[in-house]
Amino acid sequence: MGSAEQACGCKGARFCALCETTERVKKLRVVEDKHVNYKVFIYDHIRQIAIPTTNLNSQSSLEDIIDESTSCQSVSTDGSIEIDGLTLIHNFLSESEESKILNMIDTVEWAQSQSGRRKQDYGPKVNFKHKKVKTDTFVGMPEYADMLLNKMSEYDVKKLGNYQPFEMCNLEYEEVKKSAIEMHQDDMWIWGNRLISINLINGSVMTLSNDNKSFLCYVHMPHRSLLCMADECRYDWKHGVLAHHIRGRRIALTMREAAKDFAEGGELYEKYGAELIRLGNIRVPLSKTSV
């Protein structure tokens, strides 16, 4: 294995700027843009609808998407769609709250991940293929979790309240590494309905695709915003962050809650759920003063 591949965590069909010229990546079959003929929408967070647009396509830049997300607020709603379960909160964090969280995040060692990302994991080790869970390295959630969960409840207790995280993962994206995360759906065996992503340092775009309807929707996530994907958005749409939508450094603070089988009363509560909930309520101290 070459030094470039040793410097990143990519394998299989995934690659980043550090390994894109290696023999492994050169041998990969070029995948055609499957979204080239999809109908494109831009999300209007004010009216909470997705507006059809001919100004964007499957390769649109971050800057073009930002411009369109602003201008779409004054256009007709003809042809618009609602994506049930999609919630975008601008300025979820204040500058001082973000600064305190970042100071704690950067005291923790980062691990290499795939597609040019680095990560910090708080949660169980999950074997999705064999449906097994290990908790030996799960020692709790970082101390700033309580501040985030309280703010979520205060903002909208119905949509965001009573959130019991089973996992918190900080994902670092860097423009120079061409960091990305491919279009995907999160596992549905262990992870529940609401997926949370908070944008630190810089904003980006969450790209959504509904392959059954051939729809593509861009959701501009500004700096310090919170995105929740649940219900239809969670189960009928794929989501991803494309490399050309990253500027500078961005950290996505992500949270996942338990699937129903792992919650109290579920089939896997006694086997896994109870212990995961107990561990998820422990806080790992990262600073001398609390957020």
Curated annotation (Swiss-Prot):
Record key words, sorted: Dioxygenase, Iron, Metal-binding, Nucleus, Oxidoreductase
Protein's UniProt keywords contain Nucleotide-binding: no
CC annotations in GO: contractile ring; midbody; nucleus
Cofactor dependence: Fe(2+)
Cofactor note: Binds 1 Fe(2+) ion per subunit.
Positions that bind 2-oxoglutarate: 171-173
Localisation per UniProt entry: Nucleus
The keyword Oxidoreductase appears for this protein: yes
SUPFAM superfamilies: Clavaminate synthase-like
UniProt cross-references to PANTHER family, sorted A to Z: ALPHA-KETOGLUTARATE-DEPENDENT DIOXYGENASE ALKB HOMOLOG 4, OXYGENASE-RELATED
Subunit structure: Interacts with top-2; the interaction is required for localization of top-2 to DNA. Also interacts with mtss-1, his-24, ule-3, C18B2.3, pgl-1, ceh-93, mcm-4 and F37C4.5.
Similarity remark: Belongs to the alkB family.
Protein name: DNA N6-methyl adenine demethylase
